[in-house]
Every structure is written in structure tokens, then in C-alpha cells.
Amino acid sequence: MYLGRILAVGRNSNGSFVAYRVSSRSFPNRTTSIQEERVAVVPVEGHERDVFRNPYIAYNCIRIVGDTAVVSNGSHTDTIADKVALGMNLRDAIGLSLLAMDYEKDELNTPRIAAAINGSEAFIGIVTADGLMVSRVPEETPVYISTYEQTEPAATEFKAGSPEEAAEFILKGGEFAAFTHPVTAAAAFNDGEGWNLATREM
């Protein structure tokens, strides 16, 4: 089954995490690149001009802001992170950003999905052509959401103890292994000593 872009957020016995996966049929020539306190989705070498064909394919997918990790499938990662940095709570930062930026105006009306987590709470959200949803993530029950098919948060058993394991898991572990067209993945993991980042490729 093809889910498009996928993100997961939550806590397990090892710590807190956000994870993100690019699955793509139209623009598979992409990679994830770690920068300072962020991970960017960018075209691979030789395909840089793809951004002129589709403005939605390059963006920061993860941002770290203090004790908070933000993850999304587009430029709203930065909008949410900036609001969190100014002191806005996670629910409102996600909700206002999704409402303002709306779904992507491409041929498929691709939804924008997002999540954020800190030491005390986590929220996940989506905006589609039909509406907006932001909900609290249950404590110790990780959830995931995607741009297609799984457009509501779904509980998942997320087996990871590091950012490397989290990126690997959303790319091809557990139930995620059944989802088609994986390209690249990234994750942030906090084991109590702060956030660390990692990426994985197919």
C-alpha cells in the first residue's frame, strides 16, 4: 500500500522520538541531510532542478527547538518551530500553522501533516481539502499518520532506542515494511540526554 509521506511520534521505553519517511512515485530522487538541529529533504545530486517542477519536494522535515522536536512533510516544519520558539504551546503551533498554510495545491491536494513532542506532551495534526485535525498523542502510545490512506493517527509499536534505529524502523521496520516506494527517512531521538538526529536511505 502506498501512503506517501509518513511521520511517527511518541515515546517508548527507551525515550521520545519523531520519525519521518519520504515515499514517492513521482520524485524518488531525494535524500535527507542533517544540518544544525534540523534535517532537510533535498534532491540528490544531478536532480537539483526538480524543485522548479514541484516546489513542495524540498524542505526541513525535522527541527529541534530547545526540548521540542518538530516533524512535518513540508515548509510548515519551520512555521511550527518558529511559533514554538516564541513560546506558543504545541497544539496551537501545529493548528495555526496548518490552518494558515493549508493543504498543498498540487494535483492530488496533498495534505500537510505535522507533529511535535517535548518532555511533557505531544501533538499530531493534518490539514486536508476537507478539514483540519490536531490531537494529543497518548502517553507511551506512539502514533503515525500519512499523506494518503492513513490520514488519521494510528497507534503503532515503534521499536527504536536511537535516532538511527528510529529512521531505519520507519523506513522498513515493523508494519512500515509493507508500505511501498520508500526513498529516505530521518529521525530525532531523545533518551533523556537531549535530541540526536539520524538519517537512513533505501
Swiss-Prot record:
Keywords: Hydrolase, Purine biosynthesis. It catalyses: IMP + H2O = 5-formamido-1-(5-phospho-D-ribosyl)imidazole-4-carboxamide. One of its GO terms (biological process) is 'de novo' IMP biosynthetic process. Pathway: Purine metabolism; IMP biosynthesis via de novo pathway; IMP from 5-formamido-1-(5-phospho-D-ribosyl)imidazole-4-carboxamide: step 1/1. Its EC number is 3.5.4.10. InterPro entries: IMP_cyclohydrolase, IMP_cyclohydrolase-like, IMP_cyclohydrolase-like_sf. One of its GO terms (molecular function) is IMP cyclohydrolase activity. Catalyzes the cyclization of 5-formylamidoimidazole-4-carboxamide ribonucleotide to IMP. Belongs to the archaeal IMP cyclohydrolase family. This is IMP cyclohydrolase. It comes from Methanothermobacter thermautotrophicus (strain ATCC 29096 / DSM 1053 / JCM 10044 / NBRC 100330 / Delta H). The gene is purO.
